[in-house]
Amino acid sequence: MPASWPKEYRAAADFVAAAYRPEQDEAGLETIERAADRVLEETGIRFLDDPQTIDVLKQAGGVATGDVVRLDGAELRRVIRRHAPAKFLLRGRNPARDTPVGAGAPPVFAPIYGAPNVVLDNGAREAGSRRIYGELVAAAHAAPGLTNTGQMICVMEDIPEDRRPLEMLLAHLSRSDKPFMGNIASPAAAEAVIDLTAAAVARPASAGECNLLHLINATPPLTYWPNPLKCLRAIALKGEASMVSSYMMMGATSPVTVAGALIQGYAEVLAGLALAQIWRPGAPVVMGILAYPFDMRRMLPSFGDPASQLVQFYAAELGRRLGVPIRGDGAITSAKIDDAQSGAEGGRVLSASVASGASFILHASGWLEQGRTVSFEKFGRDAAALAELGKPTEPPPLPLDRDIETEICSRITRL
């Protein structure tokens, strides 16, 4: 467990956040679940070009029409609750860096994921490269506030695509001994990184433990593409963890309302979470439902909007009702530079994730321009702020003897 987030700080954060959580809105949560069940039963989920997934879902009771499978949401929840662990250990090369993920554990913080562009400390703007990637991994390792070094912190534009998974793996293993995330470029790449990471960690497989967490995204609305489906299968069969997420643009790829986005996103992730358990009961999973308003004038998402924070709070509660760890987003922003806008928007999103009880917070440092850019300056500032979140405070002074205090006060009065 990270030294900067001892148990008492998780408990304190939970106490403060309890006032904002919708756990008392039992009727609202049940309405979302029932509406998602209706979406699954009447509309279904599209599983593109993956007959294996469709076949296994049919065996589990799904009704397939082409690549669309209609599902029983209540049964999916039963599968998830029966098999998915509420907590698991994410291992690093250094056992002292191992991080628990899930119920009662501190949040895990990982940096931005997937930025093609980089802004250096001197303000120069470059495409991502192997050299820069190694520097970002080293920065994540040196930051006490980041307990996971992530994956694809920037895109290695100077490296051929088929080499990037192993180049990133080498950077994470050689520049850090913290846990990191797995690669999903292809099922073969995922398996290769899993096997090589297991060799580097050099510890036997153990129930409730894994070496990598992989980002598996649905494609809203109500679709899974072939590569995430095949990667999910390969990852689950290897006993590694998947973070099954729906990342929606409200008004573009999902309904514009908070409730509508929650219903759609919950239907999407239920299917993915249950699939992992069908492939391998007990496979570690994390649930993510994230939605951001879409600005139709600029044709870009608006990060930091309060609507997205409501989605986070309800998504976290839905995840707790399933009994699985929950994803949150970190200091994400629509700002182009690291300014007051980026601080305000990023701070709101990060605060909502922490207060909601999120177990794994992605994009916790470095994010600019709707995620198209990683900034070294913002990376360092965000990481420093994360370290302060769990920094122990000085204990109060020992109480002064009452008689001495009275004597001093009386002398002051006489003066």
List PLM regions with ranges:
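Short acidic/histidine-rich active-site segments
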Residues: 359-367
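Helix-rich catalytic cores of soluble enzyme domains
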Residues: 124-355, 359
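N-terminal small/glycine-rich loop or linker at the start of catalytic domains
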Residues: 28-32, 37, 101-123, 321-333
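Short juxta-domain linker segments that transition from a proline/glycine-rich
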Residues: 102-104, 108-112, 132, 141, ...
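Glycine-rich, N-terminal phosphate-binding loop and its surrounding beta-alpha-beta segment
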Residues: 51, 55-120
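Catalytic-core signal marking the mid-to-C-terminal active-site face
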Residues: 2-11, 22-35, 43-58, 377-415
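N-terminal basic/disordered segments at the start of proteins
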Residues: 1-28, 88-113
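Short beta-alpha connecting loops at secondary-structure transitions
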Residues: 17-21, 298-303, 331-338, 366-378
